[in-house]
Amino acid sequence: MTTILKHLPVGQRIGIAFSGGLDTSAALLWMRQKGAVPYAYTANLGQPDEEDYDAIPRRAMEYGAENARLIDCRKQLVAEGIAAIQCGAFHNTTGGLTYFNTTPLGRAVTGTMLVAAMKEDGVNIWGDGSTYKGNDIERFYRYGLLTNAELQIYKPWLDTDFIDELGGRHEMSEFMIACGFDYKMSVEKAYSTDSNMLGATHEAKDLEYLNSSVKIVNPIMGVKFWDESVKIPAEEVTVRFEQGHPVALNGKTFSDDVEMLLEANRIGGRHGLGMSDQIENRIIEAKSRGIYEAPGMALLHIAYERLLTGIHNEDTIEQYHAHGRQLGRLLYQGRWFDSQALMLRDSLQRWVASQITGEVTLELRRGNDYSILNTVSENLTYKPERLTMEKGDSVFSPDDRIGQLTMRNLDITDTREKLFGYAKTGLLSSSATSGVPQVENLENKGQ
């Protein structure tokens, strides 16, 4: 069976991921007019820039949908977001600022839940608005087929007939008007935005040029912290985790994770926390650039990693970072539910997150400027009395340390001999009396 359909399957049911925007509206209307039977599915991901979700299915029906459904994906999305924090599943960082993989997380949820809803309705052909140059076309492809092995893919934006007739936004707008719908194009921004309640992505157009900075972006989850005219008073906030799960903010306990994240977004957003500018590698190995917002994810991540460093030993923390980066890349590639990702998730949640219990107090200022004011946990292995510089009882004595240092003579001797060996073969230039490379010796030999 052909998985990807290049032309419209006339007379068949097609499920379209319907956002209500110009692209999917024109595509739905065009498919109906050409003889297909479109079904519209809208994911409620808690997008901060969406005002009326209930109106979206109604518009789909007006444009010719056989049926239109609104699928509430918020609970699942937040669950996956918390799992990503527990695992440190983030691999794109620049200068210490993290991209929290909010779009890949949204695609994992959308791609599985919408296709599951389509399957319930007997719809086995899926279309969405992803383009052939981006990551989403592959993410949706993988998640869709994981959910429904019989699924076929039809994307109007890969159909030459559709492109020839409605290849641009102007043509789409004119098409809608000609069909009796007073659809006006929204005001063109200098970039495009995609969002869910975990975060927002701003990319393309002017942001493709690296001399266009974050300053051209109007945040939808935060504030312009770079604008000195924007008043942002400092604010103290406490975050509490129990067994790796965020449960309370500023002393208020949440039984609903969705409400917890919304509050975290409000707190972090007041300061512009979690905004970052990243150059990343797309799945196809080409580089792209995005500016990201994720105020709630950033707030939870900071508190989580503070507890992590105070609770776990060095080797565990090293494995958390290494496996987290590996898992983040799998998530980015649309492999969040693949076996290799599930293996990493299970180990990180079981052996790392389960011990993260405690409370962190932060002072948030402007943007990603913050201070950690206090860290409290019954599981802390940080114990200041062990290494206090004050006089008193100690868990080890000066003689104990002398013995420990003496044992280091073995590997120090080995290292010294290797340095001399490197010098003899010309790999290093060293002094006559030691094997240690020195700047002046390198300069003298022009190496």
UniProtKB/Swiss-Prot annotation:
L-citrulline binds at residues 99, 135, 139, 192, 201, 203, 280. Its main location: cytoplasm. L-aspartate binds at residues 131, 135-136. InterPro entries: Arg_succ_synth_type2_subfam, Arginosuc_syn_C, Arginosuc_syn_N, Arginosuc_synth, Arginosuc_synth_CS, Arginosuc_synth_type_1_subfam, AS_cat/multimer_dom_body, AS_multimer_C_tail. Pfam families: Arginosuc_syn_C, Arginosuc_synth. GO terms for molecular function: argininosuccinate synthase activity; ATP binding; protein homodimerization activity. GO terms for cellular component: cytoplasm. PROSITE patterns: ARGININOSUCCIN_SYN_1, ARGININOSUCCIN_SYN_2. It comes from the Bacteria. It is found in: Cytoplasm. Its EC number is 6.3.4.5. GO terms for biological process: argininosuccinate metabolic process; L-arginine biosynthetic process; urea cycle. Belongs to the argininosuccinate synthase family. Type 2 subfamily. This is Argininosuccinate synthase.
